[in-house]
């Protein structure tokens, strides 16, 4: 059997490595939002006056919606295209970050965090799948996945630090505005440096 060009690993170029940096930033931000709010709890509690139950939902609902939507978003990306889903998710993440930042009630912040979770669930499966298709050389793919995993680990650690810095100078909602420049960068560079990929054998979409 003769190997096709698609089967032969090729070295990644400048475009792929720039694309990886964009994807890594998105992954870092996705994880950051799990922890960035922790130090803001006293300030937002004083401002929004949430009940104990509402405060738990404000903190936890993002993670719940991310975890509950990952499989669905992965299948959706297979059907409509990974890059397309990533762009939709990045735009939604930016908009819902604004809603969260300027929430005027506990209920509004809970709803915004839930929508952030749905948007965040588009980032993890889309970024990893795109990395697999951008890097076909086994060694380069291993490096790229290592960078992606490192971004996840860094996001968890950096979230409280950046959140604390923002709270030192601004109001509690400013911690959500960290997403805006990253999502803007993803939306500008994504169509230029990221390939599109659809799975012709995508499974049924389960809600």
Q: Model-derived features: where do they sit?
A:
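Helix-loop junctions on the cytosolic side of multi-pass membrane transporters
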Residues: 187-207
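Transmembrane-helix bundle of Major Facilitator Superfamily
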Residues: 2-192
């Amino acid at each position: 059997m003769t190997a096709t060009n698609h089967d032969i690993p090729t070295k990644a170029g400048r475009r792929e490595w720039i694309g990886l940096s964009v994807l890594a930033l998105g992954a870092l931000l996705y994880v950051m939002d799990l922890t960035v709010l922790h130090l803001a709890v006293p300030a937002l509690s004083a401002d929004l006056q949430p009940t104990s139950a509402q405060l738990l939902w404000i903190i936890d609902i993002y993670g719940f919606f991310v975890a509950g939507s990952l499989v669905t978003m992965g299948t959706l990306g297979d059907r409509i295209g990974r890059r397309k889903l990533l762009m939709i998710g990045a735009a939604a993440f930016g908009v819902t970050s604004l809603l969260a930042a300027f929430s005027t009630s506990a209920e509004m912040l809970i709803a915004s965090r839930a929508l952030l979770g749905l948007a965040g669930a588009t980032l993890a499966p889309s970024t990893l799948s795109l990395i697999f298709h951008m890097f076909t050389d086994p060694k380069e793919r291993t490096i790229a996945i290592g960078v992606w995993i490192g971004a996840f680990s860094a996001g968890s650690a950096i979230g409280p630090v950046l959140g604390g810095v923002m709270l030192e100078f601004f109001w509690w909602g400013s911690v959500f505005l960290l997403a805006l420049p990253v999502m803007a960068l993803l939306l500008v560079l994504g169509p230029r440096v990221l390939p599109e990929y659809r799975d012709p054998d995508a499974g049924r979409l389960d809600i």
